[in-house]
Amino acid sequence: MVNDIIADSLTRLRNASMRRLEFTQLYYAKIVVSILEIFKEKGFIKDFNVKDKDKKQSVYVQLAYDEKGHSKISEVKRLSKPGRRVYKQKNELKRFKNGYGVIVVSTSKGVITNEEAYRQNVGGEVLCSIW
């Protein structure tokens, strides 16, 4: 059993992109699906789908690459960990990496990006960053 499913998912994405794999498989969790929806919206992954197999759900992710074959994921980091939670207020969630990167924040309004949290005037737990 995995203790931190978000960190495990991010590590699997990072390893698959470094190996230039087309697909990778992740454990299913609602929060992982929420994070993947943001990654897809921002163009870091092409697509993902949830599949049932023997009463266990898995998420299959299709990674995105540019025309030269380079991964669109340069780096992905887990910021808030089970042993050390990181929370940020609205004014601390402005642009990240000059707009090229995204911080994923868990707020009272759901899992959203740092820019959306700033616009909606909410803070929350900073889950991960990607660029």
UniProtKB/Swiss-Prot annotation:
State which gene encodes it.
Answer: rpsH
Which SUPFAM superfamilies does the entry mention? Ribosomal protein S8
UniProt entry keywords in alphabetical sequence: Ribonucleoprotein, Ribosomal protein, RNA-binding, rRNA-binding
Specify whether Cell membrane is a keyword of the entry. Answer: no
What the protein does comes down to:
One of the primary rRNA binding proteins, it binds directly to 16S rRNA central domain where it helps coordinate assembly of the platform of the 30S subunit.
A single Gene Ontology CC annotation of this entry is: ribosome
Q: How does it assemble?
A: Part of the 30S ribosomal subunit. Contacts proteins S5 and S12.
Q: From the Swiss-Prot or TrEMBL record, give the protein name.
A: Small ribosomal subunit protein uS8
Concerning PANTHER family, the annotation shows:
40S RIBOSOMAL PROTEIN S15A
* Example GO molecular function: rRNA binding
Q: Which domain of life is it from?
A: Bacteria
| GO terms, biological process | translation
Tell me which family the UniProt entry assigns to this protein: Belongs to the universal ribosomal protein uS8 family.
Query: Which cysteine-cysteine pairs are annotated as disulfide bonds in the entry?
Result: none
Q: Which PROSITE patterns match?
A: RIBOSOMAL_S8 (PS00053)
Among InterPro entries, the record links this protein to: Ribosomal_uS8, Ribosomal_uS8_CS, Ribosomal_uS8_sf
Q: What is the lineage of its organism?
A: Bacteria, Pseudomonadati, Campylobacterota, Epsilonproteobacteria, Campylobacterales
